[in-house]
Amino acid sequence: MSLVYLLGGLIVIMLIVLMTLFIKSLRRFAGYIALLAPILASGYFLAQIPNVLHGKFVEFKIPWMPAIDVNLDFRLDGLGLMFGLIISIIGVAVFFYATQYLSVNRDNLPRFFLYLLLFMFSMLGIVVSNNTILMYVFWELTSVSSFLLISYWYSNAESQLGAIQSFIITVLGGLALLTGFIMLYIITGTNTISELLTQSHSISEHALFIPMMIMLLIGAFTKSAQFPFHIWLPKAMAAPTPVSAYLHSATMVKAGIFLLFKFTPILGLSDSYIYIVTFVGLITMIFGSVTALRQYDLKGILAYSTISQLGMIMSMVGLGGGIAQHSSGPMAETYTLILFAGLFHLMNHAIFKCALFMGVGIIDHEAGTRDIRRLSGMRKFFPKMNLVMTLAALSMAGVPLLNGFLSKEMFFDSLVSAIELQQFGLTLTIIVVAIGVIASIFTFVYAVYMLKETYWGEFDEKKVPKKHIHEPWLFSLPAIILMVMIPIIFFIPNFFTEHLVLPALRNVTNLGSSVDAIAPHVSQWHGVNLPLIFSVIVIIVGLILALKVNWKAITHQVIKYASITNSYRNVYRGFERYSGQMIRGLMNNRLNHYNIITVLIFSILIAYGIFQVGLPKLHQIEVSEFGPLEVILGIMISVVGIALVFIRQRLTMVILNGIIGYSVALFFLLMRAPDLALTQLVVETITTILFIVSFSRLPNIARTTANMKKETIKIIVSFIMAGAVVTLIFIAQQGDGLESISKYYTNAYELTGGKNIVNAILGDFRALDTMFEGIVLIIAGLGIYTLLHYKDRRGQDERK
């Protein structure tokens, strides 16, 4: 089954959910209709596992802008399959969870699920794109849909702030990504990702390789909340909990990691890439794990834990990047192990972190708070969530018999492998191992700290907002199913790695099925070795620190002096002040000022173009025949135009302006263009009448006398504009070697069936221009409608 059917099916479901916005009786079912989308996607990707295992890729391509190699090009490979299954299967759980979380009466269900579907569609688009520009389009669509979902409760100031902050950071990162993709196109001449991966060595030798790599890293780090771009993720927790469980733990924040996995065969050829990604990941890991301990909000703890876990995965992506330089031998086996560990932990993290977010959402929904200072003793009210969150948190901490233990062991194995690889030198390698172990200890500490503060201790009824607390079964079901997966993966890990991780590894390493021979076999017991010793140290030290130390007091003092968020706010306010000054300087409500700026910029661009390429070779200048009438009209237009500069009376100015317009119409008539003359006459008549009628609405403000200095400037600018236009006409006349585009439009009848060439141009050849012009008119009309129906609401909140 082609990818087009999957994408088409998702679009149809989105349209049906959109229809429920306007059909009141169907609004309550919007969530269940939307649930069909992740179910459909899950079924599709599960059905493709046998094909991908046998090396068969599902491909689909429609030309879009083939001249610049921008096409609707989709390709499902092993890496895309793994991410597609995570997005769709976690999506089934989250969509069902959201139907129980949101209120039919209070929340706009169609709007929420439409945004969620748009996000899922965009995320799937990223992982199956085989064209860099197409991937960028979906990349920015995830930012837009994330903005809409975070600001879903738009009356909440925190939601607005979180949405704006995440949008600014991720969109700027997206622009950096686009810059990197453009550089790749300059280097190779193609935007097709599968072709780019075959040219990795020639790309790495190009002068633009390092700038391109930096741009791609900025795009990945901003999307995956890596230090110092992590600040948007905690603020995004203002979104409804289903959004946090889906976007900000399991899917969207993995997009940057997906990008680096995808381009590892190219980027891994640089040692700088390995250094940057590894150390950024480890710094993010330890920063997130320490910062999680100063949070009182359960979602805040999970936000920083997500940042920490993403850093852990990112460090493995960086360490394993050396596979691009060593595709065979013992080193290839070690790099393969590291990349395998990163992919395996990515899957495990999606499961246990989504379960944790769902548990927190249920507590918040039923108890009315997420503040751990008010939630002690919750085990008696939420026994199922106590079990779910305990298993999920301990899995994240790396406790045996849970899936997180296996991938944490492989992470430690990766750190130990760094010693064997001698990638960083002995000193840096020791630092790498130390950071990884210390960050893992803090991961254990905040996992136990979260459970202790929420479920242990005595319940205080006075601190909890809601008095009738219960734990609905349907609400808990998705989290329970995810919890069950945690020990299952521990006991049968190779079933999942062989069907998901291994196909993805083939693409990440770019070795194909030959990587199967060196891929690791996951075992629950490897004997007593260094990774196991690290795990024991983490558990023992973590327990002592979690139970004996007051982390809230310590971390608050340490981190408050180094707040990245405050730096972001200062930079944001600085840009806001600067942009305000610029806008006030440019937008001074003087139309002639706007016209002068526009004319000067237009003329400067023409002058710059002439300076760069020079004027065309001068041929004989042909002047059209003209008679006395043309000369009289030309003199009259010039005289009236100069007079307009000095006249102050409004009515006189409008009449003189009309005279110029009618004179131009006569010019068209003399040049044998009656249709243009008629159009000019109609437009000039209508605008003149509108000007005169509008005078009755304008205030009777005395007009100042003409200022010769200002009027002289206007005359000079007018001559500059006239010179620019004449120059363009001159250039057009000298372009004898260039074929005129007007000949193409003579095919109007054959290509469009239209007998009127103007209609054919507007409706076919320039259809997009016409459509967007119509959209502009609609937007302008909506603005006018709003102004006409505006009511004075001073003293009220401007957003109400």
UniProtKB/Swiss-Prot annotation:
Cellular component aspect of the GO annotation: plasma membrane
Pfam families on file: MbhD, MbhE, Proton_antipo_M, Proton_antipo_N
Subunit-level organization: May form a heterooligomeric complex that consists of seven subunits: mnhA2, mnhB2, mnhC2, mnhD2, mnhE2, mnhF2 and mnhG2.
PANTHER family: NA(+)/H(+) ANTIPORTER SUBUNIT (PTHR43373), NA(+)_H(+) ANTIPORTER SUBUNIT A (PTHR43373:SF1)
InterPro entries, sorted: CPA3_Na-H_Antiporter_A, MrpA_C/MbhD, MrpA_C/MbhE, ND/Mrp_TM, Proton_antipo_N
Family of the protein in this entry: Belongs to the CPA3 antiporters (TC 2.A.63) subunit A family.
TM helices/strands, residue ranges: 3-23, 29-49, 78-98, 109-129, 133-153, 167-187, 202-222, 249-269, 273-293, 300-320, 337-357, 387-407, 428-448, 472-492, 527-547, 596-616, 627-647, 651-671, 676-696, 712-732, 768-788
Membrane topology according to the record: Multi-pass membrane protein
Coiled coil regions, renumbered to chain: none
Native organism: Staphylococcus haemolyticus (strain JCSC1435)
Subcellular location: Cell membrane
Gene Ontology molecular function: antiporter activity
GO BP annotations listed: monoatomic ion transport
Highest taxon in the source lineage: Bacteria
Keywords: Antiport, Cell membrane, Ion transport, Membrane, Transmembrane, Transmembrane helix, Transport
Name of protein: Putative antiporter subunit mnhA2
